[in-house]
Amino acid sequence: MDARLIDGKQAAHECTARLATRVQALRAAVGTAPFLAAVLVGDDPASCTYVAAKQRALARAHLRGETHRLPAHASHAQVLELIARLNEDARVHGILIQLPLPAHLDAARVCRAVAPEKDVDGFHPLNCGALFLAQPGFVPCTPAGIVHLLRRAQVPLAGARVVIVGRSAIVGRPLAVLLASPGCDATVTLCHSHTRGLADICVQADILVAALGKARFIGAPFVRTGAVVIDVGIHHVPDATAPRGRRLCGDVDFDAVAHKVQAITPVPGGVGPMTIAMLLHNTLCAAEYAAGMIPPFRAALYADLDGRAAGDVPH
C-alpha cells in the first residue's frame, strides 16, 4: 500500500488565497487590514524562526503585523504591561504570545492577560470554555488545522475511532474535544505518558494523531493497516546525509509506517503550514468582529474554509 500524502502546504495555500479575498472585502468596508501583534520574549532560535515564518505568511495573505521583542529576563510586570497596551490598541486585532516563554514566566498567566476577542491562539480560558461547551469562539490553531486537513482529504470523521497520543493544552486536549463535538462526531481516545498498552490502543485507530513530542516514536506496531496518520511533531535529528547534518522529522517514523497507512501528513509540509493558516484565519475573524461584520465570537473554525458561511459551525 502506497500512502497518500496529506499536503498541508497546498491546503494552506488554498486557505490563504481565500483569506486574501476576505481581506480585500474588509479593506473596502472599513479601510483597514487585519493586524497581528506577536510578543516574543527572549531570543530562542526556534521561536525567532517561527515568528518570522508567521510574519511572511501574514504578508502573503495581505494582513499586517509586527513583533514586539522583550529580553529573556523580562519580568511578569513588563510582559503584562505590553499585553495591556496591545489590548487597548484599536489597530491591533490579534495578539500572539510566542511559546515557550522563559522558565521564570507563567505562560498560563500571560495568556490569560490577552483580551479574549484578540486571543487568536485560542488559549484564553473563555475560548477554551467555549470550545468545551460547543459554543463559537477562537479554536486553537493546530487542532483547527488538523480538522481542516482531515475534511479536505475527505477522511470520514463521524463514528471514526480516533486515538490522540499527547494531552497538551495546545493540541491534544482541544483536538479531542473538537473531534468529539457534534459535526465531527468521532469517538476519541486520548492517551498520555501513563497510558498502559499504548501500541495496543493505537493499532485500533482509524485516525491516529501523534502529538507527544518524541522523535519517530510511533512505528509500525502502533499503526493499523489502512489507517490515517496525522503527525504533529517536529524535531531536528542528526543526519550525516543532510546538508547541515540535521534533518526534520516528526513523532512518527515515516518510513516504517508509510507502507501500511492509507494517508499521512509529512514533516515538514503537513500540520505546520495549516497551523499558520489558521492563525491568519483567526486574525481575520478578529478584525471582522472588531468591524462589526460578524457577531461576537463568531470567529469559528469552518468560516469560509470549505464553502460554509461563518455561522455554520458544526457544534
UniProtKB/Swiss-Prot annotation:
EC number in record: 1.5.1.5, 3.5.4.9
Any single GO BP term: L-histidine biosynthetic process
Keyword Magnesium: no
GO cellular component, one term: cytosol
Binding positions (NADP(+)): G166, R167, S168, S193, I234
Known catalytic reactions: (6R)-5,10-methylene-5,6,7,8-tetrahydrofolate + NADP(+) = (6R)-5,10-methenyltetrahydrofolate + NADPH; (6R)-5,10-methenyltetrahydrofolate + H2O = (6R)-10-formyltetrahydrofolate + H(+)
Pathway: One-carbon metabolism; tetrahydrofolate interconversion
PROSITE patterns, A to Z: THF_DHG_CYH_2
CDD domains: NAD_bind_m-THF_DH_Cyclohyd
InterPro entries listed in its UniProt record: Aminoacid_DH-like_N_sf, NAD(P)-bd_dom_sf, THF_DH/CycHdrlase, THF_DH/CycHdrlase_cat_dom, THF_DH/CycHdrlase_CS, THF_DH/CycHdrlase_NAD-bd_dom
GO MF term set: methenyltetrahydrofolate cyclohydrolase activity; methylenetetrahydrofolate dehydrogenase (NADP+) activity
Superkingdom of origin organism: Bacteria
Recorded family membership: Belongs to the tetrahydrofolate dehydrogenase/cyclohydrolase family.
Function: Catalyzes the oxidation of 5,10-methylenetetrahydrofolate to 5,10-methenyltetrahydrofolate and then the hydrolysis of 5,10-methenyltetrahydrofolate to 10-formyltetrahydrofolate.
Summary of subunit composition and partner proteins: Homodimer.
This protein's name: Bifunctional protein FolD
Species this chain originates from: Treponema pallidum (strain Nichols)
